[in-house]
Swiss-Prot record:
Function: Plays a critical role in cytoplasmic virus egress. Participates in the final step of tegumentation and envelope acquisition within the host cytoplasm.
Sorted UniProt keywords: Host cytoplasm, Host Golgi apparatus, Virion, Virion tegument
Annotated source species: Human herpesvirus 2 (strain HG52)
Family: Belongs to the herpesviridae cytoplasmic envelopment protein 1 family.
InterPro entries: Herpes_UL7
A GO CC term attached to the entry: host cell Golgi apparatus
Protein name: Cytoplasmic envelopment protein 1
Location in or out of the cell: Virion; Virion tegument; Host cytoplasm; Host Golgi apparatus
Amino acid sequence: MADPTPADEGTAAAILKQAIAGDRSLVEVAEGISNQALLRMACEVRQVSDRQPRFTATSVLRVDVTPRGRLRFVLDGSSDDAYVASEDYFKRCGDQPTYRGFAVVVLTANEDHVHSLAVPPLVLLHRLSLFRPTDLRDFELVCLLMYLENCPRSHATPSLFVKVSAWLGVVARHASPFERVRCLLLRSCHWILNTLMCMAGVKPFDDELVLPHWYMAHYLLANNPPPVLSALFCATPQSSALQLPGPVPRTDCVAYNPAGVMGSCWNSKDLRSALVYWWLSGSPKRRTSSLFYRFC
């Protein structure tokens, strides 16, 4: 069995090879594979009674960390310097009857193909979950994730990266391993932060937390590449059996930032259609907390 190359060392396949060869303990294998899972395509969900829902990935236009380590946001529709404390926005959302929480997609790192997801629409319905934070820290993390995914290149600066990384480090030091959703949010933010740094031409804090297809795209899609190279970063067209089981809904209720460096997947109609179909279906919405088994 061939040894994994340095670029492959963090992948699930490489971890399994090392486990079979006896080079890793069972605990290391479990942790290594679970670290490949992350949340993507976070967006706020709002709906008034039975009217058309609204999915917004751009409600947070800017994030800042104060000298005291507090998060504050510039919200959609506000001026560039109209910062709102994260706790105030948390309370505001909780008080609004239209606020439903956040929709998120569970992926492995290798399923993010830059311009699309390597998950067919039918399967995507089972990867979506609804997250309605009851704790300020979790709310801050999902808002930060949503912002990083839609961060425009003009905001992707070393100053932002350092502030966000330091804040995540503080949150991680106080997070219990039993806070499964919080740990998943932290891991997701680290994946997106390091990948965003790579795409912005800044040395990532951790090269192993750069999404693999994005790492390749950073080099291969520069300088107007031929279509054959661009096609590598779009998922393979799926058969009709893997499409949505009903009529494709309208997707004009999904708001995202086309200029977001990490948000190009939002251009995929399959993703937007699956999101709206999932929400409008009569089936109960899986909660993000239910993604984890309880052993005690």
